[in-house]
Amino acid sequence: NSQTILVTPPGFSAYQNYIQQAQQSPYWKNALYDGFSLPAQGQAKEYCKKWISYGCDNVKQHPNKQHYAEHTLKSCKVAFCPKCFESWIGRQANRTTRRLSKFLESREIRKHYKFRHIILSPPNADKMSYKKLKRNLDFTLKVANIKTCAIVFHPFRFNKDKSIPVRSPHFHLLVYGHVTNTTEFYNKTKWTIKNKGDLKTDKDIFSCVRYLLSHCGVRKGTHAVRYLGDISYRKLKVEKEGHIP
């Protein structure tokens, strides 16, 4: 049977395009790699995206003797949820931005370094397990002299309109510091590095991470964003953000 593919409206950003396809492309549902799937391909809970109202009619204790009511849009904030995955993306992108921003504040005396978005692609990766890929990545990072970075795993690449995922595992990194990209690096690893440019502001970091999470690999028990080096959980403590309904 033929499948209906939605055409992307003019003016859509790449992020909006991925969000639309996550919700509506029939091909995303069947994209699987070593336990990883794509965002929004699970089941929503009964309360997801429903308005919940709380109230108190103890008017004697209220200013101006008025009733009190509060309305909240409920969200499970889970990557697999077709209704709430954007809430998960926003919260995770905000957490990553705050972590990287706090690290940069502590490095104020070295302003010439910003986080840089790079893509690391291994050879013949479609037949490797994630465990083996991760082990090879660790070696590759050492050869490239990458110590401090945030890592987002992408099991798939996509066709032009982002509707059809094709298995092609690779890693997106937000890297701090100098990256060694030489002939020697390629000869030792056979991995390729693609430099996507510096992230100059917090907004750049947030937009980049949000975009990456819109079509990343998600798997229960595995962090969608991994932090290494000086931004790791062990080395950098960041206060939790306030409550988001």
Locations of the language-model features?
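Right-hand nucleic-acid polymerase module
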Residues: 1-167, 177-245
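Conserved, short, structured surface segments that act as functional micro-motifs
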Residues: 170
